[in-house]
Amino acid sequence: MTTNYIFVTGGVVSSLGKGIAAASLAAILEARGLNVTIMKLDPYINVDPGTMSPIQHGEVFVTEDGAETDLDLGHYERFIRTKMSRRNNFTTGRIYSDVLRKERRGDYLGATVQVIPHITNAIKERVLEGGEGHDVVLVEIGGTVGDIESLPFLEAIRQMAVEIGREHTLFMHLTLVPYMAASGEVKTKPTQHSVKELLSIGIQPDILICRSDRAVPANERAKIALFCNVPEKAVISLKDVDSIYKIPGLLKSQGLDDYICKRFSLNCPEANLSEWEQVIFEEANPVSEVTIGMVGKYIELPDAYKSVIEALKHGGLKNRVSVNIKLIDSQDVETRGVEILKGLDAILVPGGFGYRGVEGMITTARFARENNIPYLGICLGMQVALIDYARHVANMENANSTEFVPDCKYPVVALITEWRDENGNVEVRSEKSDLGGTMRLGAQQCQLVDDSLVRQLYNAPTIVERHRHRYEVNNMLLKQIEDAGLRVAGRSGDDQLVEIIEVPNHPWFVACQFHPEFTSTPRDGHPLFAGFVKAASEFQKRQAK
């Protein structure tokens, strides 16, 4: 089987939406029956985004196999059925780390290790490895053409086109076509210069995706085609839309998938986008609206919670409810009190690290519990709910997590000291261990308690969800909290760790140690988020009576 590669680059400015465009194209190709995957190559020096600030970089998306990756992989999984893995994302830092390890080991037999050929060869090897077994692989190059950091990646894909053959490789370039209000026209010059930059390093784009706030007129597309040496039918207009789920249809309507299939000599049926049409219909025709407060510590950059925000929207789709998400800084709860939580139909506390804002989250969990407001806690959101219950119901004064107060009297949340690494070996870690790559990561099995709320929601006795955390419920103090009424609704496959808690005699109070947002998709939703939005809607109706 021959694998075909589509290399996706961006020019003029960053944040054009390369990830969404690549994922949308992949969705169309998948709808034509092709086996498709997507890779993201990030030019930064960090080995992975695991230790990067969410306020700078956005969320860290966790794959099934436990890789901490770029948030674009979340977009990929929400658009196509193929699950991402650690093979789908790597960085300059990872490449250099691998090459330097080989150099120290003597693998290069004393050769002078250089960017070309050693770094570029390592990039090519990883791309080929990630593409094995697929009909089409889309490879998104992070950053903007012209950045120094991207040059090794661009050189590597240029070489791949020569080595694999142009009949099995395509270059797709996203570029900005700005509208000038003063003259009342769009301007193509930035696109021409961006393509010129690509040409200077030996890459001739085959497809141009023109990003604009409006449809790019046919005469302007013809002009771009002429001056950029691209067929006119391969110049695609991609205007701003009110829903990203409209983009597959927008690209298909301009024949992009047909052009690619002909170029790769792929004989496959027409794309059936009926599932996406259903998503668009549900999104455009809600029967009601709810307001859900998300109380977090990184809310100045909503991308820090990208998957949670999308999962809430998916929960809305499954209930035909429009979800209005109100982002609330947990530190504001500490300084201004619970007044800012009033008027919400439900409350969600997402994950996070560090002590800043945690007391505000604990106050939030208590407010939801005492006022019968639907509550969903994720990761840290579960831990603060447990701390609240321990303090205010189980009479464990000043209960806390050892992450925040190492010597507290009631450490109801504590560090896991024994881990299994990716090779299955037992490893002992402590608070002094490296931060990078030292968490419970990836898909883990969870057993649900028979008569629990989550057992009803999932309609299954055992589930698999993804984790990203270092701290767990302290089993030594668990009995005292359970005796006070808290219910453990889910445990790890080996029955050792608490995964889900519920508050009995509450309309809807669920908190989980895992991250359900990573497996939510617009077509399928997720049981927890669908149930949570439904509970918010029911709470709203009760309040209106």
UniProtKB/Swiss-Prot annotation:
Activity-regulation annotation: Allosterically activated by GTP, when glutamine is the substrate; GTP has no effect on the reaction when ammonia is the substrate. The allosteric effector GTP functions by stabilizing the protein conformation that binds the tetrahedral intermediate(s) formed during glutamine hydrolysis. Also activated by magnesium; the enzyme requires more Mg(2+) for full catalytic activity than required simply to complex the nucleotide substrates. Inhibited by the product CTP, via allosteric rather than competitive inhibition. Also inhibited by divalent metal ions such as copper and zinc.
The reaction(s) this protein catalyses: UTP + L-glutamine + ATP + H2O = CTP + L-glutamate + ADP + phosphate + 2 H(+); L-glutamine + H2O = L-glutamate + NH4(+); UTP + NH4(+) + ATP = CTP + ADP + phosphate + 2 H(+)
Activity response to pH changes: Optimum pH is 8.7.
GO cellular component, one term: cytosol
Binding site for L-glutamine: 352, 380-383, 403, 470
Entry annotated with the keyword Metal-binding: yes
GO biological process: 'de novo' CTP biosynthetic process; CTP biosynthetic process; protein homotetramerization; pyrimidine nucleobase biosynthetic process
Residue numbers binding CTP: 14, 147-149, 187-192, 223
CDD domains assigned: CTPS_N, GATase1_CTP_Synthase
EC category: ligase
Recorded metabolic or biological pathway in which this protein acts: Pyrimidine metabolism; CTP biosynthesis via de novo pathway; CTP from UDP: step 2/2
Subcellular location: Cytoplasm
Miscellaneous: CTPSs have evolved a hybrid strategy for distinguishing between UTP and CTP. The overlapping regions of the product feedback inhibitory and substrate sites recognize a common feature in both compounds, the triphosphate moiety. To differentiate isosteric substrate and product pyrimidine rings, an additional pocket far from the expected kinase/ligase catalytic site, specifically recognizes the cytosine and ribose portions of the product inhibitor.
Domain notes: Sequence consists of two domains: the C-terminal glutamine amide transfer (GAT) domain catalyzes the hydrolysis of glutamine; the N-terminal synthase domain catalyzes the amination of UTP.
Matches recorded under HAMAP family: PyrG
Family: Belongs to the CTP synthase family.
PANTHER family reported for this sequence: CTP SYNTHASE, CTP SYNTHASE-RELATED
Name used for this protein in its record: CTP synthase
